[in-house]
């Protein structure tokens, strides 16, 4: 909308974005206060993580602020993971860590996923994405081979997510 030549369209689009941004800032202040008052409440922690995931996905923040909140999100997810090992938390961590390019921590999360959900498609999707992102061709090829040999079930979503690599490994 910012690139639109119609001044009125641009004005309404910017006004809407500013309002939405204000709303997120207000909600952020509320949840931060709630968390500060009760940092050990798992419900508040989950609410804070869910909010940050939503807020970060909107793309409203400047790069520096986004980095600060991504770091905060990682720390909160790790705290959740300390309370309870959970696949959803691991997936959220992998999503965030890959954006941050924190491969050291991503590898640790992959190990947790491997120990707990080795036959699950989420583990394999993230392992292959991780190896591809790191340009670890040999390990990627080995993982694709293991995926086939171990007869890991992939849903249509999993096949779509790994389609590029699966198609390439058939040749």
Predicted segments — roles?
Residues 145-171:
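C-terminal non-catalytic interaction modules
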Residues 1-2, 24-38, 62-81, 103-114, ...:
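Alpha-helical repeat scaffolds
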Residues 76, 90, 109, 125, ...:
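Generic L/I/V-rich hydrophobic alpha-helical segments across diverse proteins
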Residues 20-21, 55, 100, 134:
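Structural motif corresponding to the intra-repeat A-B loop/turn of tetratricopeptide repeats
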Residues 120-122, 126-132, 137:
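Extended alpha-helical scaffolding segments
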Residues 4-13, 24-27, 39-49, 55, ...:
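Generic helix N-cap/helix-start motif at coil->alpha-helix transitions
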């Amino acid at each position: 909308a910012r690139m639109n030549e119609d001044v009125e369209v641009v004005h309404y689009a910017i006004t809407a974005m500013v309002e939405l941004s204000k709303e997120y800032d207000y909600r952020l202040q509320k949840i931060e206060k709630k968390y500060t008052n009760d940092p050990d409440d798992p419900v508040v922690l989950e609410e804070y993580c869910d909010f940050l995931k939503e807020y970060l996905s909107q793309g409203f923040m400047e790069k520096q602020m986004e980095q600060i909140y991504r770091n905060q999100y990682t720390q909160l997810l790790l705290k959740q993971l300390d309370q309870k090992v959970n696949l959803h938390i691991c997936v959220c961590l992998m999503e965030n860590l890959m954006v941050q390019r924190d491969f050291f921590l991503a590898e640790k999360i992959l190990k947790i996923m491997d120990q707990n959900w080795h036959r699950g498609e989420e583990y394999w999707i993230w392992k292959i994405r991780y190896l591809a992102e790191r340009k670890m061709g040999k390990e990627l090829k080995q993982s694709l081979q293991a995926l086939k040999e171990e007869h890991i079930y992939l849903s249509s979503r999993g096949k779509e997510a790994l389609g590029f690599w699966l198609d390439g490994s058939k040749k």
